[in-house]
Amino acid sequence: MASNWRASASWYSHPVYARYWQHYHHAMLWMQGHQNAYRKFRDSYFTSPWLFPHGALPWNSPAYEAGHPWDSQGQHMAQQESPYRVSHPKSPGQPLRNSSRTQASTRGNEARCEEEELESDSDDEVECDLSNMEITEELRQYFAQTERHREERRRQQQLDAERLNDYVNADHGLYFNHRRSLEPPSEKPWERRQAEMKRLYGNSAPKILAMETAVQLSFDKHCDRKQPKYWPVIPLKF
């Protein structure tokens, strides 16, 4: 397996691709530096004493997430309360009106929740008796037509998905592969094209391939310079 991996990885380790890999590593270093800078800014923002005094942290900060575990359903396991609430120390002579008001509002919320649960339970218990429902011929035709429409729409969606997968943009060739993968390429660039040219033109394949490459390079150069807009391939009907 190791020998096969070296054989497949040898062609893109060629020095001719060194400049590409150099740009690739520079881009990866820039992305990692950007992520580190964003992480540091996020940590400093959420731990700033001027923005969040008295230890009040937003629910999506790292310190808040570390101090509050989550269960398997993604719900909070601690007491459900606002993460922005700040707990100030009470003075000895301070009245307890705020706490009594909070307890009263909590009881009111619990009572409303219980009423909503009872209403939802009573709604779930309502059942429709369809045993005496009259099924006419018009209703049967309606159901049959609805089922036909659903089947036609399902087939049309499948055809649209297949057509979209096979669609090739105007700025790409017929052999353009738009599927992305993290795996290294299994064959060398132009290997399939060279084999096809060899099969078609025999010993004259290198000469014809060089001419085609020159024409393609000239076309790409003028396209990069002029930036033309591709005309849609639409048949004209007179």
UniProtKB/Swiss-Prot annotation:
GO terms for biological process: spliceosomal snRNP assembly. Residues 113-127 have a biased composition (Acidic residues). The keyword Nucleotide-binding does not apply. Residues 66-127 are annotated as: Disordered. Residues 131-164 form a coiled coil. It comes from the Eukaryota. It is found in: Nucleus, Gem; Cytoplasm. One of its GO terms (cellular component) is SMN complex. The modification Phosphoserine is found at S122. Keywords: Coiled coil, Cytoplasm, mRNA processing, mRNA splicing, Nucleus, Phosphoprotein. Widely expressed in embryonic tissues (at protein level). Residues 72-82, 96-108 have a biased composition (Polar residues). InterPro entries: GEMIN8. The SMN complex catalyzes the assembly of small nuclear ribonucleoproteins (snRNPs), the building blocks of the spliceosome, and thereby plays an important role in the splicing of cellular pre-mRNAs. Most spliceosomal snRNPs contain a common set of Sm proteins SNRPB, SNRPD1, SNRPD2, SNRPD3, SNRPE, SNRPF and SNRPG that assemble in a heptameric protein ring on the Sm site of the small nuclear RNA to form the core snRNP (Sm core). Part of the core SMN complex that contains SMN1, GEMIN2/SIP1, DDX20/GEMIN3, GEMIN4, GEMIN5, GEMIN6, GEMIN7, GEMIN8 and STRAP/UNRIP. Part of the SMN-Sm complex that contains SMN1, GEMIN2/SIP1, DDX20/GEMIN3, GEMIN4, GEMIN5, GEMIN6, GEMIN7, GEMIN8, STRAP/UNRIP and the Sm proteins SNRPB, SNRPD1, SNRPD2, SNRPD3, SNRPE, SNRPF and SNRPG. Interacts with GEMIN6; the interaction is direct. Interacts with GEMIN7; the interaction is direct. Interacts with SMN1; the interaction is direct. Interacts with GEMIN4; the interaction is direct. PANTHER family: GEM-ASSOCIATED PROTEIN 8. This is Gem-associated protein 8. It comes from Mus musculus.
